[in-house]
Amino acid sequence: ELKPLEELSKNLWWVWNSDGKNLFRELDHDLWRKVGENPVMLLQQISSKRLEEVLADERMMEKINATYAEFKEYMSKPMRNDIPSVAYFSMEYGLCNCLKIYSGGLGVLAGDYIKQASDSCVPMTAVGFLYRYGYFAQSLSMDGQQIANYEPQNFDQLPIEAVLGEDGQPMILEVPFPGRIIYCHVWRVNVCLLYTSDAADE
């Protein structure tokens, strides 16, 4: 009965849909803030007791089902076939705070482009990078010096999915560089259709 929550957590539709965001917030207000408004982490860390309470709450279950129905209706809209498909490339995408693949205004602009493409049913596939460390968090030392703290992103806790090849194994791209080959994993972010790659293996 709670499976719709998992599907909703893996699609960034909730980012710009107030019903979706409010649904996750209402599951556990304190935990939602603690996990940085990350629905994947929320579902991973929410207590079994709270889930039992949700299942027993008729109003909450109606809200889950209504939000999921709204999401499925949105996803059922066909892509336009009267315009060319679009390939969009950017170094960063500002989609949500929990997916640290942007650092400024241009990334937010790129994120808005693909959100609008999704709303407008434009057949767009976006390609970018999945940064392991994202942007840094700032802190101050005892003597007032700024310290840059780089915390690695745990890809298993993000609203992303590994792209699999025909053999069912994670897809890996080989990118030739001078004197070496970079091996990149391919990940999918469900918003319109955004593919990112990380080069953790070499």
Language-model-derived ranges and their functions:
Residues 143-186:
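Extended, Lys/Arg-enriched charged tracts that mediate electrostatic binding to polyanionic substrates
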Residues 195-201:
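Conserved small/polar residues in nucleotide/adenosyl-binding loops
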Residues 1-78:
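Extended, charge-enriched "interface" segments that sit outside catalytic cores
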Residues 188-194:
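Beta-strand-turn-beta hairpins that frame and shape the catalytic cleft
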Residues 118-136, 148-150:
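Hydrophobic or amphipathic alpha-helical targeting/insertion segments
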Residues 80-97:
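Structured, charged N-terminal subsegments at the starts of enzyme catalytic cores
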Residues 96, 100-123, 127:
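A conserved hydrophobic secondary-structure block that centers on an alpha-helix together
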